Amino acid sequence: MYQSACQAATTGSCVPGTGQQPDNERQSALIAQQPPTAPVEPDYSGFDIVKATQYGAIARVRELVESGWDVNQPDSETVTLLHWAAINNRRDIIRYFLEKGATVDAVGGELNATPLHWATRQGHLGAVVLLMAAGADPRIRDAEGCSCIHIAAQFAHTALVAYFIAKGVDPDLQDRGGMTALMWAAWKVCALDPVRLLLTLGANPAMVDYTHGNTALHWAILARNATAISTLVLKSKASLDVPNLRGETPLSMLESQTGAIWIGAKVMDRVKEAALTSQQRRSLLSKLRHDKRLRWWSMVACPFTAFYLAGIVFTVNTLYIIKFFLLGCLYSIFHTIGKALFDEHLMALLPLSVYLATKAWFYVTWLMYIDDAVSFTATVCFLISSLLLWVCFLKSWKGDPGIIRPTREQRFKTIIELSERGGIGFEPASFCSGCLVRRPIRSKHCSVCDRCVARFDHHCPWVGNCIGLKNHSYFMGFLWMLLIMCAWMLYGGSKYYVNQCNVRFDDFLGAMRAIGNCDAWVGWVMGNALLHMSWVILLTICQTYQVICLGMTTNERMNRGRYRHFQAKGGHSPFTRGPIQNLVDFLECSCFGLVQPKRVDWMNYYDYDAQTHQTIEKEPLLSVDCPDGMAGDHQYV
């Protein structure tokens, strides 16, 4: 019935085309030369009211109703006209029938379903909005025992699931068999949503159904739904120890599938950790492998230790070939430790830990070696630059980059407004299904941090945080201060070798031999300072050029071809106002009243008018003309 009912909507036209394709290019050319003819208006006069409703012939529908047809009269299968209008998303006809007194919750068809059930099954958000505005009850069950939210979850109609919950439907509403929308989505839908959306809106992953005693995770495992399993285990921390009526737990079910390619590596790590017995947990090796806090501290300590041991190798008075052999052994040891103890998440901490270790040994080297070789003024300048570096680093590391944090009420308001606009704002370019927020212009969802950030620049592993609206200026300060600190280390190290070892730097090879014979530790630290200085120079130049000259972020520069407001400008930033004004806007400070920053609330700036350079909308939702968002995850620099 559903397939036949939707035939009119899927064909695209109620009158099939009668023209035949030309047999050769000459016929095509002759046809192309004919003047265009006006489209022929389809003749609906022979349609009965059911067919007219299915095909959207509202004029014919009005004619038949005005002639006395009862809009609540069902057909032989107890299906009403409102059912046919709903399943074909004929919104004008739905409005007309409701005005004429159609029963909004009429039950009919093989499944004893309401028009709202029919519209939901086909994913017609517009029809659902109209029916619920007229008082349709989404909690009514059909013959299969399912309410509308269960049907929407089964067919992956994420926008409908969100709309039902925003309108007050309990996300944990159970059908006749005790199945929740989360269970149905985990069982039926292999995509990320609506499982993620349901969890974000408060669905309980611990609920069990009446028939089997399964949780949503049980159902996901039975369906081999790797996406749902990963989302439930890693995002919602669903329990692996809940037994169903057969005594099976998600842990035992996953253990029986060990080695299966459809189970993600992170999920299997979680399974192995949960499978440890209490005796295994007490062993030192097990603690090292499975104690996350201990592994985290081991990860942090490794760069500190490796830096020190490598420096000691350079200071050993032996042949260089032996030194290189020792360095190779040192690398093998730490590489083996890393593979055994560190997972992908912990490896993301490596750049931050390397930075902290390098800076810590900078301080030790300056105080123990360089301080006596330089002036008091040089030490003070080094410490001042270091203090400023710490301020900028902490603001970049622990500061809020501009995270968009909606409340539950704001999320519901966003969903309802988007839905009642016709659902035109649910596109990934304008709506984040992970955070359930409308995306302000220049914002982006960072998959590393799993959050939307206003005026997103990039995710920086060297500070372990996103760089966005509220910490971008501190990040720029971090780069400049780090550059200055590295320069001071090179200056101090050269002074140390000149004063303590009489090294002459006009002869490079001779200077390197003298450094190795005198004190290789300071040379090792100088080499690290030079290495860090090289990439910091490149990054600082790139960031400064983008901010001042281009007036765009790293994300915008890499993905400008995906944004409509950049396409309209031929790839140039529509936000640039010239180098001086760009700098003033970025720093948000005035220069003795000569120039004033243009203060824009990027947390709530949603659209850009390329003609007037003004915001045309500052409501909490995106319009259909919003810029395209990027589909990638994040950028590392």
From Swiss-Prot:
UniProt-annotated location(s): Golgi apparatus membrane; Presynaptic cell membrane
Location of the DHHC domain: 430-480
Cited SUPFAM superfamilies: Ankyrin repeat
Membrane spanning stretches: 296-315, 319-341, 346-366, 374-394, 473-493, 521-541
Keyword 4Fe-4S appears in the UniProt entry: no
Catalyses which reaction(s): L-cysteinyl-[protein] + hexadecanoyl-CoA = S-hexadecanoyl-L-cysteinyl-[protein] + CoA
Keyword terms of this UniProt record: Acyltransferase, ANK repeat, Cell membrane, Cell projection, Golgi apparatus, Lipoprotein, Membrane, Palmitate, Repeat, Synapse, Transferase, Transmembrane, Transmembrane helix
Active site: 460
Cytoplasmic-side positions: 1-295, 342-345, 395-472, 542-637
ANK repeats (start-end): 77-106, 111-140, 144-173, 177-207, 212-242
SMART domains: ANK (SM00248)
Tissues in which the protein is found: In stage 13-15 embryos, expressed in the central nervous system. At the third instar larval stage, expressed in the ventral nerve cord and is enriched in the neuropil.
Domain notes: The DHHC domain is required for palmitoyltransferase activity.
Family the UniProt entry places it in: Belongs to the DHHC palmitoyltransferase family. AKR/ZDHHC17 subfamily.
Protein name: Palmitoyltransferase Hip14
Species whose genome carries this gene: Drosophila melanogaster
Organism lineage: Eukaryota, Metazoa, Ecdysozoa, Arthropoda, Hexapoda
